[in-house]
Amino acid sequence: QIMLFTRFHPKDRHLVFSIVFFLCNTAVCGGNDTFNRGNRELQTKPQTIRIHAQYMEIELNSVETGRLEDALERVINRVSSIFKVIPVKSPLVLKRKGGCFKQWTTGRNKNRCRFYDRKYPAIGEECNKEFKVPSSHLSELSVWGETEEEPLDVRYPQGEGVRDTDFVLYVRAVSSFACTQELSPLAYATYCYQDERGRPMAGYINVCPQNMSSYSTDRLRMILLHEVLHVMGFTRHLFEDFRQCSLTDELSSMCNDSDIRRSPVQIVNGLPRLLTPAVQREAKQHFNCQDVKFGPALQKEGGILSHWNRYQMYGSIMTPNPGPPHLTFLDRMTLAVFEDSGWYTVDYSQAEDFLWGKDEGCKFDLTTSPGHTCILGEHGCHSLHRDRAVCKQLSVEGEHSVFVSEPGMECSKGDNSMAASSLEIFSRQSLCFMSNLTAQNTSQRPAGQCFSHQCQDGTLYVKLRNTGWMECPYGEFIQVENLTGVVLCPGKRDIICLDKENISTVSSSSVGQRHSSDSSKTTTSFIIYSSRAHEFFTNVYILYCSYFVLLLK
């Protein structure tokens, strides 16, 4: 084709040269917005999210303030190790929501402010009617004429913004109306501002000061993590802003649909479910269900709320009112929500093992599993066997009852002199077993008791006070000489010695961390390849155009 073009008459070559130059310049240098936008995105790599905590009104003493700051710093560090975003060009400035009474609807200044809102100076820029956002964090507020290139008046100049930040977290500790409600929450949170792609750019947490002292440091961290995940995306209102493409696919040009995701929440079998690709992938793998419309259910109590279903996801950090920290986990399905938002890339190796409902099938959230059935008020063991527990209803509807651990029921803690029976042992090696063993000649209903345990080559051994080690075959029971009753051994599907051979203790910190799957590694390497390939073909195209222009000359 090049040889044919060189046969043009010299008088026509200027025209051909102009056309070719225009085409080359358009395709490579930015005239084609789709190509150019994709090239920019490929060159913009996600980076660790930078979260800036901005402390506002704090009604705490110095000790509790220090505890809050330390706990939140640890939470922010953990979140930053999990999520990456397209970095904000410094500084981060939040676009004002208020201040303009009417905008231009046509002309060169379309969508710019035409008239000020007279009430705005008195009200100021508020976040969810809770507090005023610092003016130094906000964009300019000005009024424009219909055709002018410069604003007619600048009411508020642009603030200096927040440097080296992708998300601003406003922190308050104020005894608000919400803090005085019946549930007496430790904290609550919401988002304030979003960027042009829908990602939350700012949000706030309010810690209720009157409840602060009653929470342990571990529980404080867990609740703060729960709330931070809310403001970053785990909120029913934000589900509707999720993008059609994950950030990974969008950056690798595997998906070019910039629309928001359509109908992410759907009612299936009477329950609202989050049916987005990564969430469904993780849910199907966890529950061992391949139904097309299977996904984790959301809380439904008077409407669809911003939490997982209490029963199906029992033990997940994003259920309402999470349990004790050592029995609550940041699971893969929760992390998948953020992948599906289209705003973050996620490090799944940071997820914790979540064993509730594992391989229980498609109907686990619809019917009570036989292995998790209990009678209200009955004393037994938590499903992970780390604590004794009491059978309670999980929701006001009373659809499901499970064994719930309460403070003081941990087998790893306690005073051995205060044991419920003289046979119990409280230690880091102790777990909960259903037993009705007694030194008396009376029979009683089995209840949860704490005994020491060992795992050797997958075999479970149990030790009571004043006994030696006894093998406890899965699904069977053992009797002890001179004692009445039995110790019930956990079923084969239980988790005490599962893949943990020769481990003599199970603690909250020793639960195995999930490693990123091979598929995620493949995706990462593909992104690198795709980016390099795109750059390679762009360079070849430039050389092609240059050579063609040279021949024309």
Regions found by a protein language model. Give the residues of each.
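Extracellular mucin-like PTS segments
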Residues: S509-A533
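Extracellular zinc-dependent metalloprotease catalytic-domain scaffold
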Residues: F21-L225, V231-S516
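Bacterial N-terminal signal peptides that target proteins for export
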Residues: T6-L15, F536-V540
